[in-house]
């Protein structure tokens, strides 16, 4: 059914899978937005439009607390030549909450996360990237129906769960057929019928484990094993059945999401994906970090074991990651990190418009600041030129003169 499928795990994978897909688009991109403030993804979309890619974006008008920001996003995207619409049926009672992107009718993404700096760097979230004309076509069919405000008939044979059309029935069937285990990551597990079914399965001897937030634990029946995710804010919506099938997407297991909102999830049974998901679930359940090739691991590998910098990098810190090359990562250590064209800088940018000693980053007790060193062409944070010292936070986008962009990440 598909040529290739990949799992996106946040925090960790950041914007890279999304930007790579946007950058290789030739003809068309369809995207739904509930919330979005990531400047790298926004810039990639604008650049794709400038090279002739047809882009359509459905932007929610009912995202709580984001109404003004989404209106501004819609206006800016329209000015950039991107076709935008607000779903005609979007309302506070029946929000269009689904999170998807298709590229060139061959590649599709289904996300649990919004492309915001918070979701990309501070929340436990997942996404599925799949190369499948059939699945991309079915998602595009849904998108077109919502774009034109037309009825949609879901294909029950598809691996997609579409609310409010067939998600409840498909999810109920999957849970009912569980034989060995049910694992759920969902901070809004509230639907009475789903909870009752989970209790029934638990009483039949099938372990049911739920990862959620602290407030949720007191509301679930005792038959359901519960733990709160301590390390991140849990925003994922993921159900793993018998360790071999997973449902990932925008849909919480609550009545609004199942029966009223527009939601989209996908069923996955790929062995490698399930191994990754099970490992992440166990690490969050046990409150320990999984073994992975994350940013910290890659920085440590850049040093020989005997090198003293390796021990220093093992402690929490920051890195600058290049947008153009995800493997180009500059560690920001305690003290001063200098940036410029001269070879003696800690971060060397070979761009003639970058000053020899352009800027410096200071890290002191977890507080990170950027200072422009009276450069000729300026230092920029999230597109705005800075003067003097600027406090930084993870997720900020840094640019020096007209150089490539760097994202600041915490590790």
Regions found by a protein language model. Give the residues of each.
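Intrinsically disordered, low-complexity acidic Ser/Thr-rich regulatory segments
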Residues: 297-352, 362, 397, 402, ...
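HKD-type phospholipase D/PLD-like phosphodiesterase module
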Residues: 1-26, 32-176, 191-245, 249-273, ...
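Short alpha-helix capping/helix-loop boundary micro-motifs
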Residues: 15, 168, 346-347, 382-387
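Structural motif
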Residues: 103-104, 241-242, 333, 355, ...
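A general beta-strand register signal
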Residues: 102, 109, 240, 247, ...
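C-terminal boundary/linker segments immediately following FHA domains
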Residues: 363, 369-371, 376, 380-411
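Buried hydrophobic-core signal for structured, non-transmembrane domains
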Residues: 29, 359-361
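Short, surface-exposed secondary-structure edge patches
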Residues: 99, 237, 351, 387-390
């Amino acid at each position: 059914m598909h040529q290739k499928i990949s799992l996106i795990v946040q925090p960790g994978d950041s914007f890279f899978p999304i930007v790579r897909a946007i950058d290789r688009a030739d003809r068309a991109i369809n995207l739904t937005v509930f919330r979005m403030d990531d400047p790298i993804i926004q810039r990639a979309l604008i650049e794709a439009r400038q090279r002739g890619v047809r882009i359509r974006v459905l932007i929610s008008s009912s995202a709580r607390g984001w109404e003004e920001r989404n209106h501004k996003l819609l206006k800016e995207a329209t000015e950039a030549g991107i076709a935008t619409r607000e779903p005609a049926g979007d309302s506070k009672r029946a929000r269009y909450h689904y999170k998807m992107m298709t590229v060139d009718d061959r590649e599709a993404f289904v996300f649990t996360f919004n492309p915001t700096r918070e979701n990309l760097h501070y929340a436990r979230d997942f996404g599925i990237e799949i190369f499948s004309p059939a699945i991309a076509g079915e998602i595009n069919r849904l998108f077109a129906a919502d774009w034109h405000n037309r009825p949609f008939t879901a294909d029950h044979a598809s691996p997609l769960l579409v609310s409010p059309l067939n998600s409840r029935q498909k999810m109920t069937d999957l849970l009912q057929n569980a034989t060995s285990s049910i694992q759920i990551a969902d901070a809004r597990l509230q639907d009475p019928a789903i909870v009752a079914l989970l209790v029934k399965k638990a009483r039949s001897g099938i372990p049911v484990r739920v990862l959620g937030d602290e407030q949720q634990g007191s509301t679930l029946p005792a038959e359901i094993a519960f733990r709160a995710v301590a390390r991140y804010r849990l925003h994922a919506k993921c159900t793993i059945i018998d360790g071999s099938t997973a449902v990932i997407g925008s849909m919480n297991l609550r009545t609004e999401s199942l029966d009223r909102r527009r939601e989209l999830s996908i069923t996955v049974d790929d062995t490698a994906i399930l191994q990754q998901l099970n490992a992440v679930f166990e690490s969050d359940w046990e409150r320990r970090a999984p073994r992975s090739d994350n940013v910290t691991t890659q920085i440590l590998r850049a040093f020989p074991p005997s090198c003293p910098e390796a021990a220093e990098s093992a402690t929490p810190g920051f890195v600058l990651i290049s947008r153009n090359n995800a493997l180009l990562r500059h560690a920001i250590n305690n003290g001063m990190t200098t940036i410029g064209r001269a070879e003696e800088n800690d971060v060397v940018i070979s761009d003639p418009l970058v000053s020899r000693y352009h800027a410096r980053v200071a890290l002191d007790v977890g507080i990170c600041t950027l200072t422009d060193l009276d450069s000729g062409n300026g230092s920029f944070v999230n597109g705005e030129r800075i003067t003097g010292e600027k406090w930084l936070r993870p997720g900020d986008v840094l640019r020096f003169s007209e150089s490539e962009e760097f994202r600041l990440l915490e590790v």
